[in-house]
UniProtKB/Swiss-Prot annotation:
Protein name: Homeobox protein DBX1-B
Ranges annotated as DNA-binding: 179-238
Lineage: Eukaryota, Metazoa, Chordata, Craniata, Vertebrata
Annotated region described as Disordered, given as residue ranges: 238-266, 296-322
Pfam families: Homeodomain
Residue spans of biased composition, Acidic residues class: 312-322
InterPro entries (UniProt xref): H2.0_Homeobox_NeuralPatt (IPR051662), HD (IPR001356), HD_metazoa (IPR020479), Homeobox_CS (IPR017970), Homeodomain-like_sf (IPR009057), HTH_motif (IPR000047)
Record family assignment: Belongs to the H2.0 homeobox family.
Annotated source species: Danio rerio (Zebrafish)
Length: 322
């Protein structure tokens, strides 16, 4: 049951439902406004939609008869559709000379613009054939903005496909960074062989280093790093010994005159130096200065110490690695 107050327009605000006389509307629409003006769905659809969308199916005879007001609205809407279609056909068939022959005709007036759009207008496509509105760029794509995080959008959402990780921080920027080397763990046999070679020569050459690495089953870089660390420990201990005996740190560093310093007998050399100062040559050495005397001992000591070390190591058994 339909209420009569809904069908009939209210008496207080008739101007809201009827168009003003200043607007130029087709006669079919004017008749529609004058006959039935209300907020019904039928009237709103009839005004907003073109005639192609307003075709309605005829109810079957087996169905229940509709109400009287609904039947009147259906017949009125069909009459309005027929009137609109005939008006459009007459306007399209009329020549342009009839419009342009009018003395009040303006080339860029409202009537001319509306007439041109009416002539060039094509029938609207069906709703099924209309495509969705596309954007010039994909919204919320992975490459749209790098700072969109997946925490703002659920990963299960199909409307907003956000990748789990972004590819831009994983791109290679030049050479890959070299990782830190793991600390090598040497066995007792390897450590003894390395220590024996270090007692022979503090600065091992490349061929000897490669032979030793192959013999011990190590890498060349591992042997090189072991010798560097061992020389640092040896130099620190000798510095403390030299400083306690009155020497200097420069005696432990390699120079052009002595590229391979060997200070394994620092204590013995300083004892020998004290004996020479107490000998009859002491006044002469004092007159020449202690610097020259120490330098002379510094240059002569490597040969003596190397002979002593070769003699002492010849008695030891050679360490072999299986």
């Amino acid at each position: 049951m339909m209420l009569p107050s809904v069908i009939a327009p209210p008496a207080m605000y008739p101007s809201f439902l009827r168009p003003s006389s200043a607007l130029s509307l087709p006669p079919a629409l004017q008749s529609a406004f004058t006959t039935h003006s209300s907020f019904l769905v039928e009237d709103l659809l009839r005004i907003s939609r073109p005639a192609a969308f307003m075709h309605r199916s005829i109810p079957s005879p087996s169905a229940s008869p509709p109400a009287t007001g609904v039947t009147t609205l259906n017949t009125t809407s069909s009459a309005v559709h027929v009137a609109m279609s005939t008006a459009l056909a007459k306007r399209s068939s009329s020549p342009q000379t009839s419009i342009s022959s009018d003395p009040n005709y303006l080339k860029f007036g409202v009537n001319a613009i509306l007439a041109s759009t009416t002539r060039n207008a094509s029938p609207p496509p069906p709703v099924q054939g209309m495509n969705a509105k596309t954007f010039p760029f994909p919204c919320f794509d992975g490459s749209f903005h790098p700072f969109i995080r997946a925490s703002y959008f659920p990963a299960s959402s199909s409307a907003v496909p956000i990748p789990g990780t972004f590819a831009w921080p994983l791109t290679a920027r030049g050479k890959p960074r070299r990782g830190m080397l793991r600390r090598a763990v040497f066995s007792d046999v390897q450590r003894k062989a390395l220590e024996k070679m270090f007692q022979k020569q503090k600065y091992i050459s490349k061929p000897d280093r490669k032979k030793l690495a192959t013999k011990l089953g190590l890498k060349d870089s591992q042997v090189k790093i072991w010798f560097q660390n061992r020389r640092m420990k040896w130099r620190n201990s000798k510095e403390r010994e030299l400083l306690s005996s009155g020497g200097c740190r420069e005696q432990t560093l390699p120079t052009k005159m002595n590229p391979n310093p060997d200070l394994s007998d620092v204590g013995k050399r300083f004892e020998h130096e004290a004996v020479l100062r107490e000998s009859p040559r002491a006044p002469f050495c004092q007159s020449r200065g202690d610097h020259e005397f120490n330098a002379d001992l510094h240059f002569k000591s490597p040969s003596i110490s190397s002979k002593h070390s070769d003699f002492s190591e010849s008695e030891d058994e050679e360490i072999t690695v299986s």
